[in-house]
Amino acid sequence: MAKFHAPVIQDNPSGWGPCAVPEKFKDMPYQPFSKGDRLGKVADWTGATYQDKRYTNKYSSQFGGGSQYAYFHEEDEASFQLVDTAKTQKTAYQRNRMRFAQRNLRRDKDRRTLTQFNMQTLPKSAKQKERDRMRLQKKFQKQFGVRQKWDQKSQAQLKPRDSSVEVRSDWEVKEEMDFPRLMKMRYMDVADPLDIECCGALEHYDKAFDRITTRNEKPLKSIKRIFHTVTTTDDPVIRKLAKTQGNVFATDAILATLMCCTRSVNSWDIIVQRVGNKLFFDKRDNSDFDLLTVSETANEPPQDEGSSLNSPRNLAMEATYINHNFSQQCLRMGGERYKFPNPNPFVEEDTEKSEVASVAYRYRRWKLGEDIDLIVRCEHDGVMTGANGEVSFINVKTLNEWDSRYCNGVDWRQKLDSQRGAVLATELKNNSYKLARWTCCAILAGSEYLKLGYVSRYHVKDSSRHVVLGTQQFKPNEFASQINLSMENAWGILRCVIDICRKLEEGKYLILKDPNKQVIRVYSLPDGTFSSDEDEEEDDEDEEDEEEDEDN
């Protein structure tokens, strides 16, 4: 007779599955899966595991974790590839686990510090407690500010620079040259210069200035002497020479501006006049061309506005004032002068010699190939006599310290004597364009030495009093190598600019450095632009109109 046998039922009061694993399934590897997952491998035990067992099932599901390299058979057999069992990608927590731990430790430390600060073990005055609170607050703000700057890489935005001259709507762009292209220019076919005419008289350098240190600094004197900054077309000697020789005329300062233009940051402009087959490079009347820039090439140049002590224009005026005074104070003023064959062409007859600055002009001629005959007016600032009586011409320039807290500056009073190389390296970084121009002018003039004076403010907030902290002497060609100034590239840039201007029609043009881009442009100017004669005629007409109104 049939009999019903009751099956053995396993009661699991704490779960839904069986209480024990059957013998045939014991020790069998198992990976969690879902019925919705597609099967792509026979077995896969390469799934990622957490090092910290507390978070094994907290942040992610393990279902489908072994399907990264699963093979699914499809009709396109070309997609089949063999893969190795590499590690799967770590989760966000695993990647940042160490950083999270450090942040938690730092937060706990700050919390303990605050707790200790809030505990009043000893009675303190109200002022002392406020002082401690402010000190701790500044410490936390400083730490937080550094982390915020590192994370966000926030930097002060530089203000857009102004153009040296306003570009009018009727000016037409004839040519545009970018600095990367100019930096690749090379010209080596430069013949040795020929001296055509030498004018002026020079005072001798006072070697006592070579012994100045930061311990025995010397006050900078205000010397009232006349400095002539005459442009090319107003030079009577160049006008005379242009009738018989040469087809390109300029001054050393104008040429140095063009030859070193790839280092410039601020805007500048040069007027080019083509008369027949001759080119004249001029500077604009009443422009800032002769002002010396300060920290122009620094990462964060001065950006104060208005009448601020450290505004770019006030700093340029201060640097020019210092340079003029030091270039005369370091000479033996009132002594016998070294005279060239011809007198200074810019000195009037009724002017005393002591009122004129010590300067000599050397008019030199270069042949750039077969078609360019270049005549340049170069300058010397002084003369030195060697032990054997040999004469050496020098150019004297000045570097000035305005505030060492800005532009990654170095305190000259502490570092100039012991680490002069570091001071010069900082100045080369902040004033690369200015130093390159000075070096280029000294090479063009044929000066044997370039004298650099280090002048600082007597007080950081006083721009009217200065002290001389030291001097340094270089040979121009050697100094050019130190500052990475390639004269082959400089001559290549000049030759390129001359060739472009010679292709233009007769007229007046303007070479303008873009204030915010590494580009120089050549503009054609309408007749009468920047003409001093036109301004004088307008003034005369205004005066005549006023006289007629008074008569009526």
Curated annotation (Swiss-Prot):
The keyword Protein biosynthesis is assigned to this record: yes
Stretches assigned to coiled coil: none
Disordered: annotated span: 525-552
Region RNA gate, residue ranges: 288-302
GO BP annotations listed: cap-dependent translational initiation; formation of cytoplasmic translation initiation complex; translational initiation
Subcellular location: Cytoplasm
Biased composition (Acidic residues): 532-552
Alphabetical UniProt keywords: Cytoplasm, Initiation factor, Protein biosynthesis, RNA-binding
Cellular component GO terms, alphabetical: eukaryotic 43S preinitiation complex; eukaryotic 48S preinitiation complex; eukaryotic translation initiation factor 3 complex
GO molecular function, one term: mRNA cap binding
Annotated Pfam families: eIF-3_zeta
HAMAP family with a match to the protein in the record: eIF3d
Chain's role: mRNA cap-binding component of the eukaryotic translation initiation factor 3 (eIF-3) complex, which is involved in protein synthesis of a specialized repertoire of mRNAs and, together with other initiation factors, stimulates binding of mRNA and methionyl-tRNAi to the 40S ribosome. The eIF-3 complex specifically targets and initiates translation of a subset of mRNAs involved in cell proliferation. In the eIF-3 complex, eif3d specifically recognizes and binds the 7-methylguanosine cap of a subset of mRNAs.
Free-text comment about domains: The RNA gate region regulates mRNA cap recognition to prevent promiscuous mRNA-binding before assembly of eif3d into the full eukaryotic translation initiation factor 3 (eIF-3) complex.
Similarity annotation: Belongs to the eIF-3 subunit D family.
PANTHER family reported for this sequence: EUKARYOTIC TRANSLATION INITIATION FACTOR 3 SUBUNIT 7, EUKARYOTIC TRANSLATION INITIATION FACTOR 3 SUBUNIT D
Quaternary organization: Component of the eukaryotic translation initiation factor 3 (eIF-3) complex, which is composed of 13 subunits: eif3a, eif3b, eif3c, eif3d, eif3e, eif3f, eif3g, eif3h, eif3i, eif3j, eif3k, eif3l and eif3m.
Name of this protein: Eukaryotic translation initiation factor 3 subunit D
Native species: Danio rerio (Zebrafish)
Gene: eif3d
